Amino acid sequence: MTKGKLLTTPSRLLKLVLPLSTVDHNTDRKDVAPLALLVHPQQPLSYLERLIQAELPPPDPQDSKSTTRSVTFRAMEAKDDEIKPRKKADTEGGGGSDGSVQSYSGAGREGEGKDEGEFVRWSPSTEIGDFIRDAARAKEFEVEIEGSPGVIKVAVPSFNDRTYYLRQRLRRTSRKISKLAAIKEECDKAAHRGAQRIALAGCGGLIGYWYIVYRLTFETDLGWDVMEPVTYLVGLSTLIGGYMWFLWHNREVSYRSALNITVSARQNKLYQAKGFSLQDWEGYLEEANAMRREIKAVASEYDVDWNETQDEGGDEKVTKALRDERKNNNGTKNKSKEGEEDDEDD
C-alpha cells in the first residue's frame, strides 16, 4: 500500500487509512500495516495531527529537539484558482470570471485529466470537512510527516463517496415509503368516498325532512299552526345538538371540520384493517427528509447538483409525501415563531 485512503462510514465519520512508515534501514522487513483513524468532519486538522503523532515513534534526539514529529497537510491549489482583484465592477450584480471567486468541484478521486497546480499547506485549525472540500478539486492531498522518507498521497473522496451510505439509506427508506404510500393512498381514497356518502346521506335526510313537513303541513289536517312550533323545535334542537357535538370534539364550527373528523375516523379504521402504522409512516418521512438535508449540505459543500429524484426511487408518490412533510414542518415552525413573537409583544 503506497497511498492513503479517506473513506466514509455508516456512522457518518471519516475513516483515514495511512500507510505509516518510519525510517528503517532493514531491507528484509515486510510492509508496515496501514493505520486507520476515525475522525469527524467538524474536527480540526490539529486533532487529526495529534492522532497521527500518537502512533509515531519519537524523533531522534540528535536530529530534532522536539519530542514529537510534526505533521503537515497540503492540498493542491489549481492555477486557475489564483485569487485576483476584479478588473471591472459588475453593476448588474452578476458574477464575473475574473473576480476573486474560487471554483469548486466534487469530482475528487473520480476527476478526469491531470491535476495542475502546487500544494499549499493548510492551517491545523481548519476543519477537516473544509479541508476535504477544497482538496476535492484535485484527486489527492498530501500528508507530510517529519522524518519520513516521503509524503503520503491520500485519495480525496468525491461527493458520491461522501454520501454513499446516506444515499443507500435514503433509497431503502424510500422503498419503504413507496410501499406504505400505496396502502395509504388506497385507504385515504376509501375514507373520502365514505365521507362523501355520509354527506350525501345527510343531504337526502334534509330533503326527506322537508318533504315530510310539506306533506304534514299542506296535505293533512295538522296545518301550519301545529307544524310551525314542531319545525322550530326540531331546527333549534338540531342546532344545539350540532353545536354541542363540535364542542365535545373541540373543533371549529364548520363543514370542513365535520368532514375532517369523519374522514379521520374512517382512515384510522382502514389503517388498522390494512396493517398501516401511521407512526412508522411519519418516522420514515422524518428520517428520509433528515438524510436529504444532510446530502444537500454535502452537495452544497462540493458545489454539485444532486439529483434527489433518482435516490428517492423515482416514485412521484415518495417525492410528494416528502415535500408535503417538509411543508407541514415549515408551517408548524412558522406558527410557533409567530406565537413566540406574540408572547414577547404581550
From Swiss-Prot:
Residues 217-226 are mitochondrial intermembrane. Pfam families: MCU. The keyword Ion transport applies. Residues 76-91, 109-119, 315-328 have a biased composition (Basic and acidic residues). InterPro entries: MCU_C (IPR006769), MCU_fam (IPR039055). It comes from Cyphellophora europaea (strain CBS 101466) (Phialophora europaea). This is Calcium uniporter protein, mitochondrial. One of its GO terms (biological process) is mitochondrial calcium ion homeostasis.
